[in-house]
Amino acid sequence: SLSNKSAGNSVSYTKEEYETVIFDKVLLEKTSMLDTPFWNRIVQILGGVVERTTSVVAYGMGSFETKNAIVQMGCLLNLVDYLRRRNESCSVAVEIFDPVMSELDVGLVEKLGFACVKENENCKRIAKESTLFFLPHGDIFMYGNLLETNIESDTLENIILVGNGLTNYIENASRLGSGLAFQNHQEETQLSLKSICKVREILVENVVHRHRIAPPKQQIRPGATGAKVEGDKQQQGISLDGNLERAFNDTSICTFARRKQQ
């Protein structure tokens, strides 16, 4: 059984009770999200890049006893439904992994029709086909491992990345002296992400925080140097409700194009 500590009084669930209670909460988040500007913005961005996407890999959502994970799973269900509608002739395979997931979490994932990755890949999945990677609030090493693996396998263009703002991660890490850098094994040097590929990054939302200046009207965050940045500059910042804000603050969608060798 699992103790649900977030409910005030400690509640223990059996496997069946856990799957039923959390399953219902996930479906509620899934349904309520469909009417939000946040979800409409995701659909607007993904519309031109997922025509052939039939694989989804989600890392780092955590245990579904947390509210963030429940909201994020609701979003993932909507993403999968959207991909299946866009690719009616193909099935969409979904795999999920987080090392903190319990047996009850694994049971819930399977009840939802998804598969759990059996071993910790450390986010080193090669995108052999067009794959949507869902990394809400992922750590920078997760992005680094995923990108470096696909740089080495020359499969960067198969990645659609939904997660934390990548440009902010790169800039913040660089200030700390730990920026994303990738090994050039032939020349034994390190290369920055921007020197290897073009990054197209679109911010899903600008959260309006209390006691802070409202975000600018421009909805597209400047990408990495040399990046191709597109979008509707007249789009207003989207103010999320509390649950969405905590689960998806600073979310962006990135695609990548390998730079041609000189």
Protein language model annotation of sequence segments:
Residues 1-59, 63-86, 97-262:
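Domain-level detector for long C-terminal conserved domains
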Residues 92-95:
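Short beta-strand element of Class I
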